[in-house]
């Protein structure tokens, strides 16, 4: 499915390249940089799945590889420091490049290293999960966790290019596929109801071209949003639907309990319930959301982990979206979205939250 989307950024424009031939597309992206040093950053899972691909990279380029333990715990300043050490040891200059190959953790981590090493070196993203292809790789957000807080340290630093290949999804476990669908449903529910309806009816096993079309449509929606509001002052805030609660769940629960897309699904359900309670969203829309989550085996409650509303509320207070005095939720409406500001001292809201979980 060779296609290209061009993303306009106030920092730096870049292309999203859809391809069935990753090696050729990467070579085209590198151009004259083929002779420069490249550091490929990936995790153990991706490295073992695609070791032959990394061997081909090593044959064609002046390439080094940084492989780290899989999982969100590696999205840390300690791992950043280890990658800095390798860049320094191999004498990487400002003209050399990083290539990230993996899911959202790999992209966020590698992008953060690229943004901060020598105050910024170029990088290319090759996302290998559905979630990273449709969401985390798009828009330039990079960062790491800090002291148990999700994405606490980061920046907006766009890549030179993003290479999208659905062939990577052939090795993706069903649970991770559903996590990607969760983010696609998020953008569809708020911004593109026809996309939401297509995802509701989609048959993965029999419609590969349909999946490619849905991925392209989802990415196109996010591209449009980040071009209008790159630094999240208005419209891009809508993409945080489900994320206030979702990030708190991720901070308090082990990754085995809830993966990112699953935590966001629970967050979307609670945000939608809040919207229904305030007359902003028809209950039929909430029911539709619950039905499609059930179809993709996405959780809608916190039954897998023993987490209290009080502990969640305490984590809310550290959320990046907050104002000085308020916790910010993104609520879906019949025609889009709105924000809900909850006072950080509103203990009655804790009781309300407890009733919604």
Swiss-Prot record:
Top-level class of the enzyme under EC nomenclature: lyase
Q: Where in the cell is it found?
A: Cytoplasm
Q: Tell whether Zinc is among the UniProt keywords.
A: yes
> Which EC numbers characterise this protein's activity in its record?
4.2.3.4
Q: Name one Pfam family in it.
A: DHQ_synthase
Per its record, the protein catalyses: 7-phospho-2-dehydro-3-deoxy-D-arabino-heptonate = 3-dehydroquinate + phosphate
**Is-annotated flag, keyword NAD?**
yes
Pathway terms, separated by semicolons: Metabolic intermediate biosynthesis; chorismate biosynthesis; chorismate from D-erythrose 4-phosphate and phosphoenolpyruvate: step 2/7
Q: Which GO terms describe its molecular function?
A: 3-dehydroquinate synthase activity; metal ion binding; nucleotide binding
Q: What Gene Ontology cellular component terms go with this record? A: cytoplasm
Q: Name one GO biological process term.
A: aromatic amino acid family biosynthetic process
**Cofactor(s) the protein needs:** NAD(+); Co(2+); Zn(2+)
Q: What is its main location?
A: cytoplasm
Kindly list the positions annotated as binding Zn(2+): 183, 243, 260
- List where the protein spans the membrane: none
**Mind telling me which SUPFAM superfamilies this protein's record contains?**
Dehydroquinate synthase-like (SSF56796)
Keyword terms, alphabetized: Amino-acid biosynthesis, Aromatic amino acid biosynthesis, Cobalt, Cytoplasm, Lyase, Metal-binding, NAD, Nucleotide-binding, Zinc
The record's comment on protein family reads:
Belongs to the sugar phosphate cyclases superfamily. Dehydroquinate synthase family.
- Biological role: Catalyzes the conversion of 3-deoxy-D-arabino-heptulosonate 7-phosphate (DAHP) to dehydroquinate (DHQ).
State the protein's name: 3-dehydroquinate synthase
Native source organism of the sequence: Streptococcus pyogenes serotype M3 (strain ATCC BAA-595 / MGAS315)
**Which gene does this sequence derive from?**
aroB
């Amino acid at each position: 499915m060779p296609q290209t989307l061009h993303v306009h950024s106030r920092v730096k424009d870049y292309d999203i390249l859809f391809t069935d031939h990753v090696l050729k597309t990467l070579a085209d992206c590198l151009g004259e940089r083929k002779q420069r040093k490249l550091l490929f950053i990936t995790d153990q899972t991706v490295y073992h799945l695609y070791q032959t691909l990394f061997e081909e990279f090593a044959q064609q380029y002046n390439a080094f590889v940084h492989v780290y333990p899989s999982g969100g715990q590696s999205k840390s300043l300690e791992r950043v420091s280890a990658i800095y050490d390798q860049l320094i040891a191999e004498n990487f200059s400002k003209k050399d490049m990083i290539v990230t190959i993996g899911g959202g953790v790999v992209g966020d981590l590698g992008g953060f290293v690229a943004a901060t090493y020598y105050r910024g070196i170029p990088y290319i993203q090759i996302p290998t999960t559905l979630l990273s292809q449709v969401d985390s790789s798009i828009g330039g957000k990079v960062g790491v966790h800090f002291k148990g807080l999700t994405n606490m340290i980061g920046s907006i630093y766009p890549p030179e290019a993003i290479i999208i290949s659905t062939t990577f999804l052939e090795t993706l476990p069903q649970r991770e596929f559903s996590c990607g669908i969760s983010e696609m449903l998020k953008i569809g529910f708020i911004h593109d109801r026809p996309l939401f309806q297509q995802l509701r009816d989609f048959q993965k096993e029999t419609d590969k071209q349909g999946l490619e079309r849905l991925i392209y449509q989802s990415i196109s929606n996010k591209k449009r949003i980040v071009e209008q509001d790159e630094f999240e002052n208005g419209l891009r805030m809508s993409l945080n639907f489900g994320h206030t609660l979702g990030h708190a769940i991720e901070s308090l629960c082990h990754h085995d309990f809830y993966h990112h897309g699953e935590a966001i699904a629970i967050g979307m359900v609670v945000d939608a319930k809040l919207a229904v309670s305030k007359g902003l969203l028809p209950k039929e829309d909430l029911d539709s959301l619950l039905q499609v989550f059930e179809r993709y085996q996405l959780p809608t409650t916190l039954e897998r982990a023993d987490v209290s509303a009080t502990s969640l509320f305490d984590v809310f207070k550290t959320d990046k979206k907050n104002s000085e005095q308020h916790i910010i939720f993104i609520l879906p409406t019949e025609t889009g979205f709105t924000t809900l500001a909850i006072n950080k001292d509103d203990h009655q809201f804790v009781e309300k939250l407890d009733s919604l979980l």
